[in-house]
Structures are given as structure tokens and as C-alpha cells.
Amino acid sequence: QECKCHGVSGSCTTKTCWNTLPKFREIGFVLKEKYNDAVHVEVVRANRLRQPTFLKIKKVRSYQKPMETDLVYIERSPNYCEEDSTTGSVGTQGRLCNRTSPHTDGCDLMCCGRGYNTHQYTKVWQCNCKFHWCC
């Protein structure tokens, strides 16, 4: 929820509030965590016509069954490291990576164990620095 105050000279004589959605980055972070913790399930067909089809945990990593808010999957994700025209994945080979980053832009993760070549770049830019004589 966000609020805004209205009034003379910044006073808050009237306050207007409204509901807002979470930031896109926050939603993405939660979805990525759910993706990382997703549970593999398999479809179990009923033997009788009156029984419904349901999902069963494929590999038991704990004795707890997934909650309604957990992410489950039936098929494994494609290998994003390799090019795959059927899924539209262009792979990660030849992309620039950050050698010191532990995140998805880091070479250890992006290069998928293939190794990588390092290049040193020098960037020159206007810094708008000012010199102040102090003493």
C-alpha cells in the first residue's frame, strides 16, 4: 500500500492511500526461489473411470508433500547451456560474463563448466570530479 499526504506547506491534513502490486524485481526473486525449490511430480492415471487423475511426488527429498503455494513440475527444464532450436534456447556459448560475480552473469554459472577466456577492459569516462583545497 502506498499513501500520499495532501495539505498546506506539507502538512498531512488529508491522506490518500491505495493498494499497489509488489515491485517486479521482488516478484521475480520469489519466482526464481520457487523454481529452484520445485518438486518433480509424475501424473498417475486412475484405473477406474470414476477416480480422478492426480500427481504423485517423483523423488522424495523429504517426507512433506508440496504445499499449494509450492511450484511442481512434470518435465525437466531444457539445458539452457546448449543451443536448442526446438525450445528457442540460444545457449550461453560466446556470451560475455563477469568472472567475479556469483550470480547468473558470473562465468562459473554461465559457462556451464566449459571454461572461459579472460580479457581485461579499460573504461574511460567523465567522472565530474572536483578538487577542494582544504588546508
UniProtKB/Swiss-Prot annotation:
Glycans are attached at N98. One of its GO terms (molecular function) is cytokine activity. GO terms for biological process: animal organ development; canonical Wnt signaling pathway; cell fate commitment; neuron differentiation; positive regulation of JNK cascade; tissue development. The keyword Ligase does not apply. Disulfide bonds join C3-C17, C5-C12, C81-C112, C97-C107, C134-C135. Keywords: Developmental protein, Disulfide bond, Extracellular matrix, Glycoprotein, Lipoprotein, Secreted, Wnt signaling pathway. It is found in: Secreted, Extracellular space, Extracellular matrix; Secreted. Residues 41-69 are annotated as: Disordered linker. A lipid is attached at S9 (O-palmitoleoyl serine). Belongs to the Wnt family. This is Protein Wnt-7b. It comes from Xenopus laevis (African clawed frog).
